[in-house]
């Protein structure tokens, strides 16, 4: 057996022993030893193999799967720029705490700095954005290699899963030719793993008791939920009388403490003067809304963070305590505190939805509400990082039976189609995505599925306003910048999304009437795109009218 084949087979076997069941492969020549080993393992039913020809898409597909399963997913590529194209997914996984195991093939040392083809410096390619980097030595037919290879896989898998907060790890693998199996199975030592399929090295600590917050003691507190932990946060808030707000509004929250219009209420200075919390307990990375950042930067508010690991977010540098879970009771709650938030939520919600009913269809908030209302129970909803996540938070009805996925680690729009497909494959139930046109087009390669690849049951709703609608709501969209806005912020593209879908063999529907929308969203098998065309010129006015309606309901 040639050394590269032996190494690849051992690495794949030990990955399976460490619980890896999902692998995404981008094809190439230098990673051929891994490709053969992965194909054999998939044929034997030991793992599910997904093949993608675009490495960026492959990385985000793996990220989507890992986000839903919370188990390490492996992504494999060849050398050169193939490896650099995984960097956006690695960045997202780093800041969101998603367990990825990145295996990059490389040239052996004698071909580096020598002008060899498809060769770059891959040593620590992803810098500080991986929990572990290791470059394995070039494989040799000598005793001790089996134990070395298996030990390093266990080390990487343990770091990806994380004792407190998992994330991406990177193994760089220099393969020397020959790169294809020779048919000869002779080796200088047995290449078997431990008996009964056990890991080569068991790492204690991944299942130890999580740390808990000890300084939760306010009678007037808020819980702010980003991604993950919505169920436990909802239960904790209801038990102790703390209102629970989310960056996805009422979608994913449950219980009597859930405040579906929380992002609107935080935006009302008059309301917040009377309802300023003493403590805010943040769950995850709350990064979308400026009103949230203003609250967290308030020197009169103590901020606690339920978030494992060292990469906890604190832009205002004022977090009082960080732990993995909420901890014990904060003590007796102010009996009027939660009631005040609940009553405000009821008033704001009634005014908001009455105002939405008056808006002309389609626009972002109205479409977001319609999508959420149409979701079957138990659905997955993937949200694009620009307007869709904001539209759902500001306009959707309360849906505790829906699971939300967002790429909010670094909040880029790249890879969202691929991440949605990965999340849908792992979810196994009805799955939907709500994306803007730029987010969709940025990762349209994600629609490229080979005939032997798994196809998700996923409906992608694209709100197409021909450009960057998010900027209409920011300072750049104010009237004094009208002369430059369209060229450098609006960025119209004129792309025919239907033709693009047809090129990939993906079903596409354009919905022009609201009465058609519910029918188009009915659950059906397979991958499809539902396009809704909107005018972003009206978006700023829509948000101003909704804000005025909520403000009027609470302040007259």
UniProtKB/Swiss-Prot annotation:
Source superkingdom: Bacteria
Reactions mediated catalytically: isochorismate + 2-oxoglutarate + H(+) = 5-enolpyruvoyl-6-hydroxy-2-succinyl-cyclohex-3-ene-1-carboxylate + CO2
Cysteine pairings via disulfide bonds: none
GO biological process: menaquinone biosynthetic process
Cofactor(s) this protein requires: Mg(2+); Mn(2+); thiamine diphosphate
Family the UniProt entry places it in: Belongs to the TPP enzyme family. MenD subfamily.
Coiled-coil stretches: none
Cofactor, how bound (note): Binds 1 thiamine pyrophosphate per subunit.
Pathway where this protein functions: Quinol/quinone metabolism; 1,4-dihydroxy-2-naphthoate biosynthesis; 1,4-dihydroxy-2-naphthoate from chorismate: step 2/7; Quinol/quinone metabolism; menaquinone biosynthesis
Listed EC numbers: 2.2.1.9
Cross-referenced SUPFAM superfamilies: Thiamin diphosphate-binding fold (THDP-binding)
Name under which the protein is recorded: 2-succinyl-5-enolpyruvyl-6-hydroxy-3-cyclohexene-1-carboxylate synthase
Pfam family, one: TPP_enzyme_N
Task performed by this protein: Catalyzes the thiamine diphosphate-dependent decarboxylation of 2-oxoglutarate and the subsequent addition of the resulting succinic semialdehyde-thiamine pyrophosphate anion to isochorismate to yield 2-succinyl-5-enolpyruvyl-6-hydroxy-3-cyclohexene-1-carboxylate (SEPHCHC).
Keywords of the record: Magnesium, Manganese, Menaquinone biosynthesis, Metal-binding, Thiamine pyrophosphate, Transferase
Alphabetized GO MF terms: 2-succinyl-5-enolpyruvyl-6-hydroxy-3-cyclohexene-1-carboxylic-acid synthase activity; magnesium ion binding; manganese ion binding; thiamine pyrophosphate binding
Subunit structure of this chain's protein: Homodimer.
Organism per entry: Saccharopolyspora erythraea (strain ATCC 11635 / DSM 40517 / JCM 4748 / NBRC 13426 / NCIMB 8594 / NRRL 2338)
PANTHER family (UniProt xref): 2-SUCCINYL-5-ENOLPYRUVYL-6-HYDROXY-3-CYCLOHEXENE-1-CARBOXYLATE SYNTHASE, PROTEIN PHYLLO, CHLOROPLASTIC
Name of encoding gene: menD
């Amino acid at each position: 057996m040639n050394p590269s084949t032996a190494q690849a087979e051992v690495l794949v076997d030990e990955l399976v022993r460490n619980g890896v069941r999902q692998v995404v492969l981008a094809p190439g020549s230098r990673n051929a030893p891994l490709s053969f080993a992965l194909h054999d393992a998939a044929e034997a039913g030991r793992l599910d193999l997904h093949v993608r020809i675009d490495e960026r898409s492959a990385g985000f597909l793996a990220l989507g799967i890992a986000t839903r399963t919370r188990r390490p997913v492996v992504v494999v590529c060849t050398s050169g720029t193939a490896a650099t194209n995984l960097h956006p997914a690695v960045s997202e996984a780093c800041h969101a705490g998603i367990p990825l195991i990145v295996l990059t093939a490389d040239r052996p040392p004698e071909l580096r700095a020598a002008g060899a083809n498809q060769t770059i410096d891959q040593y620590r390619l992803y810098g500080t954005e991986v929990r572990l980097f290791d470059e394995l030595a070039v494989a040799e037919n000598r005793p001790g290699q089996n134990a070395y290879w298996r030990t390093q896989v266990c080390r990487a898998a343990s770091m990806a899963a994380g004792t407190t907060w998992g994330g991406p790890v990177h193994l760089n693998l220099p393969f020397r030719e020959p790169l294809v199996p020779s048919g000869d199975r002779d080796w200088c030592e047995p290449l078997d793993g431990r008996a009964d399929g056990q890991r080569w090295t068991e790492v204690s600590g991944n299942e130890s008791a999580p740390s808990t917050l000890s300084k939760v003691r306010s009678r007037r507190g808020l819980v702010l939920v980003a991604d993950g932990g919505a169920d436990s946060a909802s239960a904790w808030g209801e038990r102790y009388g703390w209102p629970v707000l989310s960056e996805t509004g009422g979608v994913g929250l449950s219980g009597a403490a859930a405040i579906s219009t929380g992002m609107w209420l935080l935006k009302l200075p008059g309301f917040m003067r009377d309802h300023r919390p003493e403590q805010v307990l943040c769950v995850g990375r709350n990064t979308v809304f400026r009103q949230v950042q203003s609250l967290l930067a308030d020197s009169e508010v103590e901020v606690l963070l339920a978030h494992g690991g060292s990469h906890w977010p604190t832009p205002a540098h004022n977090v009082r305590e960080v732990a993995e879970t909420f901890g014990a009771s904060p003590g007796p709650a102010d009996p009027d505190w939660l009631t005040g938030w609940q009553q405000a939520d009821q008033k704001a919600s009634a005014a908001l939805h009455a105002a939405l009913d008056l808006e002309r269809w389609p626009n972002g908030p109205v479409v977001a509400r319609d999508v959420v209302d149409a979701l079957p129970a138990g659905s997955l909803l993937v949200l694009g990082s620009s307007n869709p996540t904001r539209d759902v938070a500001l306009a959707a009805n309360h849906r505790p039976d829906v699971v939300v996925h967002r790429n909010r680690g670094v909040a880029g729009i790249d890879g969202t189609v691929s991440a949605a497909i990965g999340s849908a494959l792992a979810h196994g139930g009805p799955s939907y995505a709500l994306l803007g046109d730029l987010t969709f087009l940025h990762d349209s390669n994600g629609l490229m599925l080979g005939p032997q690849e798994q196809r998700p049951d996923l409906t992608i709703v694209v709100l197409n306003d021909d450009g960057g609608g998010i900027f209409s709501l920011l300072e750049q969209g104010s009237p004094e910048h009208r002369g430059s806005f369209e060229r450098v912020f609006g960025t119209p593209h004129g792309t025919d999304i239907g033709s693009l879908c047809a090129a990939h063999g993906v079903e596409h529907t354009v919905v022009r009437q609201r009465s058609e929308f519910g029918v188009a969203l009915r659950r059906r098998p397979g991958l499809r795109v539902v396009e809704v065309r909107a005018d972003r010129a009206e978006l700023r006015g829509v948000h101003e009218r909704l804000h005025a309606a909520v403000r009027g309901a609470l302040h007259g």
